[in-house]
Amino acid sequence: MKMNVESFNLDHTKVKAPYVRIADRKKGVNGDLIVKYDVRFKQPNRDHMDMPSLHSLEHLVAEIIRNHANYVVDWSPMGCQTGFYLTVLNHDNYTEILEVLEKTMQDVLKAKEVPASNEKQCGWAANHTLEGAQNLARAFLDKRAEWSEVGV
């Protein structure tokens, strides 16, 4: 039975992480286009990101990616802790998205601190690790050639 949530219709046993895939496209009544990407770091049901590393990578990418692309709406973690969703507005160039993600991950490796990792700006400020986030980014970058190979 087809479900309302796109990712619930994805056969998670047939994908091969890491990958970047278009998860959804929506056209607004005024013609705006919203594209949601599934940016998968870990193999579903086999591995996951630990929460401090995921949380820190969320902060780093959410801040840094906007230096490379003004059409980014959101970068948010998946509850299963295997990846993130990247949502963009009025932009439909998959190759450019891969390039932006690559530049962003390279910048994550150069970061000296996790942005907004304090009690004033974050709801769980004690739950961060720059080293963990950089390890995730490095592992993702190491498999750059595989990002477009989803496996489904």
From Swiss-Prot:
Fe cation binds at residues 55, 59, 122. The keyword Transmembrane does not apply. Transmembrane segments: none annotated. Binds 1 Fe cation per subunit. Its cofactor is Fe cation. GO terms for biological process: quorum sensing. This is S-ribosylhomocysteine lyase. It comes from Helicobacter pylori (strain J99 / ATCC 700824). The lineage of its organism: Bacteria, Pseudomonadati, Campylobacterota, Epsilonproteobacteria, Campylobacterales. The gene is luxS.
